[in-house]
Amino acid sequence: MTKSVRLEEGDASKVLVPVGSNKGVSVMDLVLRLVGIAGTLGAAIAMGTNEQTLPFFTRFVVFNAEYDDFRSFRLFVIVNAIVCAYFVLTLPLSIVHIMRSAARGSRILLIIMDTVMLALLTAGASAAASIVYLAHNGNTSTNWLPVCQQYGDFCQGASGSLIGSFGAVVVFILIILLGAIALSRHAKRVVL
């Protein structure tokens, strides 16, 4: 039978955190980094290989739509490649955190760098999303017609690559939250 103890005001929010409790957080960090690699690499490859050719009246006159026709799409591919490389470079550090869950300085560095990469990836994905939106809907006030009716495959490829990139944005948010949780567990007593 458990003993009933009356708590003083404020005592309920102080919890003892067992040593080694960051191992699960570190494993989840590693898994999310692997998912981030898949998302950013897939997005960069999908956009980088995205092109469609349409014949016009004859087979000698054709119109091409390629990702490098738009600066926003070029930025998107470059940013996703940079973030993918960052994910790969931080995998060993994530593995070190599994073995040594008390590594505090490297966790702080990772949180800062993860936040920088999150901002970079969000900027690149948002720039590409604005162009994809214009391609799908056009802009009637400037007489820009939607081009996805003619270049359907190109627009589908661009939209699909955005899914991978914005998925990686969500992964970064989760990684930053996990890093903050791991840092907060380093103290002997944590106020929740």
Swiss-Prot record:
Residues 48-75, 129-161 are extracellular. GO terms for cellular component: plasma membrane. Glycans are attached at residue 139. The keyword RNA-binding does not apply. Disulfide bonds: none annotated. It is a multi-pass membrane protein. Residues 1-26, 97-107, 183-192 are cytoplasmic. Pfam families: CASP_dom (PF04535). Keywords: Cell membrane, Cell wall biogenesis/degradation, Glycoprotein, Membrane, Transmembrane, Transmembrane helix. It comes from the Eukaryota. InterPro entries: CASP/CASPL (IPR006459), CASP_dom (IPR006702), CASPL (IPR044173). It is found in: Cell membrane. One of its GO terms (biological process) is cell wall organization. The chain crosses the membrane at residues 27-47, 76-96, 108-128, 162-182. Belongs to the Casparian strip membrane proteins (CASP) family. Homodimer and heterodimers. Regulates membrane-cell wall junctions and localized cell wall deposition. Required for establishment of the Casparian strip membrane domain (CSD) and the subsequent formation of Casparian strips, a cell wall modification of the root endodermis that determines an apoplastic barrier between the intraorganismal apoplasm and the extraorganismal apoplasm and prevents lateral diffusion. This is Casparian strip membrane protein 1.
